[in-house]
């Protein structure tokens, strides 16, 4: 593991005091997940680096704190980490956090966040198999305005601890979460798409979902009518729509998407098999790989 911390790259985890403010109170902190891919020419490139760094910056603004590095400095630090790790597929996790102790809760004087960036080789994910993963719809609510999901902050993901007992009980790999109206908005750490015929639906960005960079990339590929028609003779219609449980149960195909998991098919939801036409999922798997590997 390589870590960029205080303008230097170290070989171990950055030191974290167990009496730190973020550990006790869930913030202030913001983070990002990025992937670097080996390209066709043998180089290694971070996918959508500028977009990820800007989202990190935006997250810090939303929670009212400052990252004391420019976007260019953060991008350079990420690229230096990739060079240190050699040409292999990598996962990067920048995290900016308030570096004060828990007793400072009523007397914080600084608005500046400390920044560490972790970089590790990424393993092949078993859940990326063609078989797909099993999921349930949980009763856990992740909704605006209780959660400001436009900010990628640890506090917004604390509800994973509420979901985990359900996953352990049912033996499934992930769960969908709801908004205040009972619509399905996200998986625990991923956006999702629902395919029905040539219509591909995804929840609207109304505050209850993270505006995913992978989600946007998938939508761009599916919306490239020239590519879809010339290569696959299929032209889908991608729409943002409030998603119900019935939309999930009657779908031809459902798939998750996110930086770490990439694109993952869902094979079962609440004990109901999702086993219709999965051709759009297979197209996205192929074309997403082409995009991140520099083949497109």
Regions found by a protein language model. Give the residues of each.
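Helix-start/capping segments and mature chain N-termini
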Residues: 1-69, 73-80, 103-296
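Short, internal active-site loops enriched in acidic
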Residues: 97-102
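Short secondary-structure junctions
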Residues: 83-90, 227-229
């Amino acid at each position: 593991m390589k870590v960029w911390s205080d303008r230097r790259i170290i070989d171990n985890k950055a030191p974290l005091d167990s009496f730190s403010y973020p550990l006790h109170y869930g913030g202030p902190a913001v983070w990002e997940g990025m992937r670097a891919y080996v390209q066709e020419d043998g180089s290694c490139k971070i996918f959508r680096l500028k977009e990820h760094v800007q989202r990190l910056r935006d997250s810090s603004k939303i929670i009212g704190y400052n990252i004391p590095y420019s976007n260019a400095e953060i991008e350079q630090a990420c690229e230096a980490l990739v060079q240190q790790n050699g040409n292999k597929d990598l996962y990067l996790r920048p995290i900016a956090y308030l570096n004060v102790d828990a007793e400072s809760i009523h007397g914080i004087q600084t608005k500046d966040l400390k920044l560490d960036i972790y970089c590790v080789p990424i393993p092949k994910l078993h859940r990326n198999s063609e078989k797909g993963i099993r999921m349930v719809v949980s009763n856990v609510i992740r909704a605006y305005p209780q959660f400001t999901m436009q900010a990628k902050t640890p506090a917004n993901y604390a509800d994973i601890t509420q979901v985990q007992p359900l996953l352990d009980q049912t033996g499934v790999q992930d769960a969908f979460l709801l908004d205040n109206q009972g619509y399905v908005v996200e998986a625990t750490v991923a956006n999702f798409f629902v395919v029905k015929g040539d219509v591909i639906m995804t929840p609207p960005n109304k505050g209850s979902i993270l505006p995913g960079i992978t989600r946007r990339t998938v939508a761009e590929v599916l919306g490239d009518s020239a590519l879809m028609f010339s290569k696959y003779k299929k032209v889908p219609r991608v729409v943002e729509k409030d998603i119900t449980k019935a939309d999930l149960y009657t779908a031809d195909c459902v798939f998750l998407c996110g930086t770490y998991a990439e694109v993952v098919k869902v094979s079962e939801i609440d004990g109901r098999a999702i086993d219709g036409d999965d051709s759009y999922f297979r197209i996205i798997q192929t074309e997403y790989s082409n995009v991140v590997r520099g083949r497109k």
